[in-house]
Regions:
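Long, acidic/polar, low-complexity amphipathic helices and coiled-coil-like
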Residues: 187-193, 197-201
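Chitinase-like catalytic core of GlcNAc-active glycosidases
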Residues: 1-186
Length: 208
């Protein structure tokens, strides 16, 4: 997982607080601590290199608690249809197929209302059921939706990957960074107990 590429396709930046775009922030980018735009798409060069080397190219969907203003995960769940599907999920599938990248890294680092957790699961399942890859970040927990980094794969985050009732929700999880060797082993064991291959579904590493 890396944050350093820039999209060539534009980012949604609704409700960006103008107060943050002051003279200092504009003239000295070291002061620009905030980051707006919830959707970051990999550019064509990034995707091309990834595919040439047998790797996936995935976009990022990022919600955090301190720098997204009025942009929240609830935007993803808008307009639910009578059949229970979500228009935004279909649009994300369309975007990925059009630009030729493989899927999305869902970085939900702000709390999810517990009442919305089942809908969020259904939203992601709708995407993977159409062949688009989803990787979940070890952040919002199940079933209450609060952010609590587990640093391992366990019962608090595994339903975001494999739900006992709904089945597969996403393809993999990327663990938060404060893990140990024992935690990684426990993560692998937990994945196997769910019938998941940890080599393909449980990732850990560093942030660049």
């Amino acid at each position: 997982y890396t944050d350093y590429y820039g999209t060539w396709h534009g980012q949604p930046t609704a409700n960006v607080p103008k107060s943050l775009y002051d003279e200092k922030a504009q003239s000295d980018w070291t002061q620009k601590w905030f980051e707006f735009g919830t959707l970051n798409l990999p550019n064509a060069a990034y995707t091309n290199v990834a595919h040439k080397n047998g790797a996936k190219s995935i976009a990022t969907i990022f919600y955090s608690g301190n720098d997204r203003g009025e942009q929240t995960y609830k935007d993803l769940l808008q307009g639910k249809r009578a059949d229970g599907t979500y228009p935004v999920a279909d649009k994300l599938v369309e975007i990925a197929k059009y630009y030729g990248f493989d899927g999305y890294f869902v970085n939900q680092e702000s709390s999810v209302n517990s009442a919305d957790v089942p809908a969020y699961q259904d939203f992601m399942k709708q995407i993977i059921d159409q062949g688009i890859y989803i990787q979940w970040y070890d952040s919002a927990t199940y079933p209450n939706g609060g952010v609590s980094y587990q640093n391992m794969f366990n019962d608090a985050n595994s339903p975001w990957v494999q739900d006992p009732n709904k089945g597969k929700i996403s393809d993999s999880i990327f663990l938060n960074y404060w893990f140990s060797g024992n935690m990684l082993q426990d993560s692998a064991d937990h994945a196997k107990s769910l019938g998941i291959d940890p080599k393909y579904a449980v990732f850990a590493g560093i942030e660049a």
